[in-house]
């Protein structure tokens, strides 16, 4: 996918995190990219929350708030901090697949699910050094977005 945004933003309202500031990295996947999504950290899935919505072009910023999406709150094993991963459905096929359950332990790079074609993943994190840059192509399970 392609890093389309790295910015400071409040957390998702759907997880009652609107009063917490995070760094958000957005990764847009076009129809030619692999759409398998992998966990950005080793930790435990604390919460999964589905939100129905529209099917706008996932490269648009407003897709984060308006499109169908699935939220994962993952408690990082190493730091104890929460990392939020959001699968955002896109314009074309419009299907989010979740392959994990609440309470499940994950290792960094484990498969979480997939989004079918023309979609996006947003990752919210705190207290990390951002390694990725806007415009950079990244590969799930291989490219580092941020580090301790």
Model-identified regions with their sequence ranges:
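Contiguous, well-folded functional domains in the mature portion of proteins
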Residues: 2-148
């Amino acid at each position: 996918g392609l890093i389309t945004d790295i910015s400071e933003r409040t957390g998702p309202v759907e997880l009652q995190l609107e009063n917490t500031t995070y760094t958000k990295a957005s990764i847009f996947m076009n129809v030619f990219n692999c759409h398998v999504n992998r966990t950005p950290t080793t930790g435990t899935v604390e919460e999964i929350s589905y939100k129905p919505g529209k099917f706008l072009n996932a490269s648009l910023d407003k897709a984060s708030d308006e499109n169908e999406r699935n939220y994962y709150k993952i408690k990082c094993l190493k730091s104890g901090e929460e990392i939020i991963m959001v699968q955002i459905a896109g314009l074309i096929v419009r299907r989010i697949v979740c392959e994990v359950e609440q309470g499940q332990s994950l290792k960094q790079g484990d498969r979480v699910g997939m989004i079918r074609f023309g979609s996006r993943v947003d990752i919210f994190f705190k207290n990390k050094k951002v390694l990725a840059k806007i415009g950079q192509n990244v590969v799930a399970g291989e490219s580092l977005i941020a580090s301790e």
